Amino acid sequence: NGVCMHHDLGCLGAAVNTRAIERHLQILKEMGCNGIRCSHNPPAPELLDLCDRMGFIVMDEAFDMWRKKKTAHDYARYFNEWHERDLNDFILRDRNHPSVFMWSIGNEVLEQWSDAKADTLSLEEANLILNFGHSSEMLAKEGEESVNSLLTKKLVSFVKGLDPTRPVTAGCNEPNSGNHLFRSGVLDVIGYNYHNKDIPNVP
């Protein structure tokens, strides 16, 4: 019985107020909730401390976008330079919390689809960003995995290198077999945010 929980606290805004977070969790518990998805960014440490103490399980989410922007000035501007450092700090900070049962590497990232900008990188850019054992010659071969699938593999591998004990997922909003995150084959749990009626049609 889980919910997606954004980091703001209503009229209090995004500032951390431990008592307000505790009250929020108490209300959720009274509703029968026992699971939290931190959407769509790392939560305040205070939230995880409270979830540890109050008996919630947490899906801890790192990113709301990768390299393809959703708004003009979002994290996509910094992804190439900062994603490894931020993912490293995120996992190391949160991995000792017993409430955390799964990592999420992204929410509805636009790299799910073939028309995402990630598929139009030059070979040099792709190798620079991915650095995942694929030469530019390999990437150029017909039938080679998409850059988006390789990026998914890279992120999951990075997470598993820091914490091999927990499954990794991503929140996806188009359940079809062409989804590059699905096609990577590395997500332990396939996240479907919508289109429940279509789920039986996806292998």
Label each residue range with its predicted role:
Residues N1-D115, K141, K153, V168:
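Active-site-adjacent substrate/metal-binding segments within catalytic domains
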Residues R53-G55, F79-P203:
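Active-site neighborhood of glycoside hydrolase catalytic domains
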